Amino acid sequence: MERRIFGIETEYGVTCTFRGQRRLSPDEVARYLFRRVVSWGRSSNVFLRNGSRLYLDVGSHPEYATAECDDLSELVVHDKAGERILEGLLVDAEQRLAEEGVTGDIYLFKNNTDSAGNSYGCHENYLVGRHGEFSRLADVLIPFLVSRQIVVGAGKVLQTPRGAIYCISQRAEHIWEGVSSATTRSRPIINTRDEPHADAERYRRLHVIVGDSNMNETTTLLKVAVTDLVLRMIEAGVPIRDMTLENPIRAIREISHDMTGRRKVRLANGKEMSALEIQSEYHSRAAEFVDREGFGPVHRQMLELWGRVLKAVDTGDLSLIDREIDWATKYQLIERYRAKRDLPMSSPRIAQMDLAYHDISRTRGLYYLLERNNQVDRVAHEPRVFEAKNVPPQTTRARLRGEFIRRAQEKRRDFTVDWVHLKLNDQAQRTVLCKDPFKAVDERVDKLIASM
């Protein structure tokens, strides 16, 4: 597949601290957050002018799904734009609460677990051809995805019966199946529910739900770029060593608990390999593939970073990657603080730091403190992020959806949209079906807009 459509869906954690008598439940806090959305969209499930979807998911979790992107850097920009949109809702909600006499702070966390042990996800979407054998895709991808956490995990302080330990992945403890059609009940690595949001005869949507939510833009870019490379190798028929895991679910937890990347996990053929060895195998195949096929600068930069992360894990020298990779950045931050204050990993202050790293408020969040102090690298520069809050990607179907929404709102027309339909709710109930996610220009949509 020459071009590929990508998308990221992120569920956010919500909590609120109060200083007065009145208390609000998480459901009520979520309703305050979405009050402005509901006032213009008449729903807590809306599509925005930038082509994205914003909605309140199960369990009062705000969720933002980026518009369809065919460019990796643009995907990162749109993921960050979603963060900024939610930050704006947070500021509005706090002002509204203050006007009503409720004193408190609302927090939105771009992480994957709350203090009660609940998990919420960051789902990656990759458009793949229908003609390929999906089961083979999953077979090759699962060992890659299980071990990928040592490269792009978000890091977590995990309380265990033997004390607190620092883990590489937040999501690893909450994955229960390899491949499944459910997302909440069983939490698989790859979700197989067949919803391509495109021409079902031509495409499938690979829905990866094993990944962590990343604060660092470079980690997000790396996560999607290396997965895209592995997909392209599979699609091109590149021979990849059989590293099928005997028990992917046990392996994902064992790998997460070992920052050295050296702990061996058992393969289905009885052999054993470490996460470092598994990732190195994929990386060396990818390096040959990129050299042979010729890729653009983004894939080449991410291939270099992938190798550098593996070197950092191998040598234990996290200074090689602590500006770019979330789990390393957070670990170094926590370790410096612990050394200064002589604190154990189990200290409540460390748990608080772990959470504060993921606070999306730019005035309060620990990650944004590092960003202000130029201690982390960026790939999505702020003017582009600001523009992406309102402007859809211009080379995919998202452009049609965004333009339709913008014009309908300006003309005060009642409309309904989803990923594939654009509908004017007038007497004629005119609807355009947009099955091709690569198509950014469509005469039928132009006519529908002109008729408003």
Swiss-Prot record:
Annotated ATP binding sites: R53, T66, W419
Catalytic activity: ATP + [prokaryotic ubiquitin-like protein]-L-glutamate + [protein]-L-lysine = ADP + phosphate + N(6)-([prokaryotic ubiquitin-like protein]-gamma-L-glutamyl)-[protein]-L-lysine
Key words, A-Z: ATP-binding, Ligase, Magnesium, Metal-binding, Nucleotide-binding, Ubl conjugation pathway
Example GO biological process: protein pupylation
Pathway(s) of this molecule: Protein degradation; proteasomal Pup-dependent pathway; Protein modification; protein pupylation
EC number(s) per entry: 6.3.1.19
GO molecular function annotations of the record: ATP binding; ligase activity, forming carbon-nitrogen bonds; magnesium ion binding; ubiquitin-like protein transferase activity
Active site annotation, chain numbering: D57 (proton acceptor)
List of residues binding Mg(2+): E9, Y55, E63
HAMAP family per UniProt: Pup_ligase
Additional facts recorded: The reaction mechanism probably proceeds via the activation of Pup by phosphorylation of its C-terminal glutamate, which is then subject to nucleophilic attack by the substrate lysine, resulting in an isopeptide bond and the release of phosphate as a good leaving group.
NCBIfam families: pupylate_PafA
Function: Catalyzes the covalent attachment of the prokaryotic ubiquitin-like protein modifier Pup to the proteasomal substrate proteins, thereby targeting them for proteasomal degradation. This tagging system is termed pupylation. The ligation reaction involves the side-chain carboxylate of the C-terminal glutamate of Pup and the side-chain amino group of a substrate lysine.
Family classification: Belongs to the Pup ligase/Pup deamidase family. Pup-conjugating enzyme subfamily.
Protein's recorded name: Pup--protein ligase
Organism: Geodermatophilus obscurus (strain ATCC 25078 / DSM 43160 / JCM 3152 / CCUG 61914 / KCC A-0152 / KCTC 9177 / NBRC 13315 / NRRL B-3577 / G-20)
